[in-house]
Curated annotation (Swiss-Prot):
Keyword Chaperone: no
Provenance organism: Trimeresurus stejnegeri
GO biological process: arachidonate secretion; lipid catabolic process; negative regulation of T cell proliferation; phospholipid metabolic process
Record family assignment: Belongs to the phospholipase A2 family. Group II subfamily. K49 sub-subfamily.
Protein name listed in UniProt: Basic phospholipase A2 homolog Ts-K49a
Site (Hydrophobic membrane-disruption site (MDiS)): L127, F130
Site label Cationic membrane-docking site (MDoS), positions: K128, K133
Disulfide partners: C42-C131, C44-C60, C59-C111, C65-C138, C66-C104, C73-C97, C91-C102
InterPro entries, per the entry: PLipase_A2 (IPR001211), PLipase_A2_Asp_AS (IPR033112), PLipase_A2_dom (IPR016090), PLipase_A2_dom_sf (IPR036444), PLipase_A2_His_AS (IPR033113)
Main localization of the protein described in the UniProt heading: secreted
Residue(s) at site: Important residue of the cationic membrane-docking site (MDoS): K121, K124
Organs and tissues of expression: Expressed by the venom gland.
GO cellular component, one term: extracellular region
Tree of life domain: Eukaryota
């Protein structure tokens, strides 16, 4: 159980409601979110935004940009709720910021599914020090 929690915390850099985000990713891709995406490429997991290695890595880049736009809620601490209806994620928050955070997580989960063909197991655990800085803005 402790190992599961540690892996969940690695998932996309401790941001967001980690449990909900992990469930979304699993529901959309069928992959273990922590081991498949927790340290993928240059943008998944802890650290700043870098030049994406592929479309899957770009999903994480865009996710970090989405979180950067949030106001009035804390993606690290705050939690939201969502439901899985007819194989679709439905964000169910009344709080506008929590709803937006849920939408950010929904978008990255769908992005991962849509880019499963670019997923490269060799990039699953990437040393971030070999990642290039990017001048691209969110």
């Amino acid at each position: 159980m402790r190992t599961l929690w540690i892996m969940a915390v690695l998932l996309l850099g401790v941001e967001g409601s980690v449990i909900e985000l992990g469930k979304m990713i699993f529901q959309e891709t069928g992959k273990n979110p922590a081991t498949s995406y927790g340290l993928y490429g240059c943008n998944c997991g802890p650290g700043g935004r870098r030049k994406p290695k592929d479309a899957t890595d770009r999903c994480c880049y865009v996710h970090k940009c989405c979180y950067k736009k949030l106001t009035d809620c804390d993606p690290i601490k705050d939690r939201y709720s969502y439901s899985w209806v007819n194989k679709a994620i439905v964000c169910g928050e009344d709080n506008p910021c929590l709803k937006e955070m849920c939408e950010c997580d929904k978008a990255v989960a769908i992005c991962f599914r849509e880019n499963l063909d670019t997923y490269d197991k060799k990039k699953k655990i990437n040393l971030k020090l070999f990642c290039k800085k990017t001048s691209e803005q969110c």
